[in-house]
Amino acid sequence: MAKAPVRTRKRVRKQVSDGVAHVHASFNNTIVTITDRQGNALGWATAGGSGFRGSRKSTPFAAQVAAERCADAVKEYGIKNLEVMVKGPGPGRESTIRALNAAGFRITNITDVTPIPHNGCRPPKKRRV
């Protein structure tokens, strides 16, 4: 007896007008995640996942490419306005914001959410090379 064909429903993408771009810029890599206002991730990209390995991963150009790839991933949601939250001291902070602006998003505000300790944990000892 023949199996009945399995019907798959086409996933309908919800339309989101405003989004939040979370940029985590470390010294070694840059991670860009675009979420809706509630924090549900819509798309993400990293400099390492964009084809950059080793020391090239920690360049501003790699962060720019990661931001462009993330922007392409969330275009189908219809996002027009972005709020950017930048975390970390890495070299990809500025270039990520420029790339998101060039991708056609209107950036409403930029917030620095880098965690700063109020004299918390003891930092690691200094390197002696």
UniProtKB/Swiss-Prot annotation:
Family matches, as InterPro entries? Ribosomal_uS11, Ribosomal_uS11_bac-type, Ribosomal_uS11_CS, Ribosomal_uS11_sf
Pfam families per UniProt: Ribosomal_S11
In terms of SUPFAM superfamilies, this protein maps to: Translational machinery components (SSF53137)
Gene Ontology annotations of biological process type: translation
Carries keyword Ribonucleoprotein? Answer: yes
Disulfide-bonded cysteine pairs: these are none
Q: In Gene Ontology terms, what is one molecular function of this protein? A: rRNA binding
Q: Sorted alphabetically, which keywords does the UniProt record give?
A: Ribonucleoprotein, Ribosomal protein, RNA-binding, rRNA-binding
Its domain of life reads: Bacteria
Is Amino-acid biosynthesis there in the keyword field? no
Recorded GO cellular component terms are:
ribonucleoprotein complex; ribosome
Q: Which family does it belong to?
A: Belongs to the universal ribosomal protein uS11 family.
Complex and partners = Part of the 30S ribosomal subunit. Interacts with proteins S7 and S18. Binds to IF-3.
Q: Relate the protein's function as given in its record.
A: Located on the platform of the 30S subunit, it bridges several disparate RNA helices of the 16S rRNA. Forms part of the Shine-Dalgarno cleft in the 70S ribosome.
Q: Which PANTHER family match?
A: 40S RIBOSOMAL PROTEIN S14/30S RIBOSOMAL PROTEIN S11 (PTHR11759)
Q: What is this protein called?
A: Small ribosomal subunit protein uS11
